[in-house]
From Swiss-Prot:
GO biological process: regulation of translation; translation
Record function comment: Binds directly to 23S rRNA. The L1 stalk is quite mobile in the ribosome, and is involved in E site tRNA release. Protein L1 is also a translational repressor protein, it controls the translation of the L11 operon by binding to its mRNA.
Recorded superkingdom: Bacteria
Subunit structure, interactors included: Part of the 50S ribosomal subunit.
Pfam family, one: Ribosomal_L1
GO molecular function, one term: rRNA binding
SUPFAM superfamilies, alphabetized: Ribosomal protein L1 (SSF56808)
Family, as annotated: Belongs to the universal ribosomal protein uL1 family.
Name by which UniProt lists this protein: Large ribosomal subunit protein uL1
Amino acid sequence: MAQSKRVKAITAAVVPGKTYAFEDAIKILKTATKAKFVESIDVAVRLGVDAKKSDQQVRGSTVLPAGTGKSVRVAVFAPAGAKADEALAAGAEAVGMDDLAEKMQAGDLNYDVVIATPDAMRVVGKLGTLLGPRGLMPNPKVGTVSANPGEAVKNAKSGQVRYRTDKAGIIHCTIGKASFDDEALKSNLQALLLDLVKAKPATSKGTYLQKVSVSSTMGPGVTVDQSSLSLK
């Protein structure tokens, strides 16, 4: 019932078809936020791509300058030595090779991000059926296969988010918490959009950033006027 009231409040405050300056859009969301937990602020970006074509799928990662507000647990596959030490020093919760793989196969999968050095992928490859369905399989496109595991761990813990177009060519991503101030949320959204522009497929035609909408957890979206953002 409470959620229904909140959705109605946001819907009532939004004029159909209108775009809102970022600050106004966030104000609408925050005013209607009544949940007992700190809600996330999410963004949906409709891109001018044909997601059915492999050369127009957009996938990557962005380090949000103001972070995500979430605590991130990281596991790293790296051979013993400098790379493993580097990952531990950066704050990884677990580092290993076959020993770490065995722990995961035994059920130790309480991680938000799994990172691997290129030479550790021979071990990680055996865990595809475990990590793949959970979205944890390391991938160079999103920076989780890296020759610099320490840097990758720091990125993951400091607010790195991963994105990928869905079947409709839309990117869904979290840009922070409702408790963040407006400037922090704005800087995070701008960083994401700038990286999306850099990732624009060469074969994409017409308007690329077609629509940007922000919403609170499980709430309806409010369309953002892109001219209220700094995208250069």
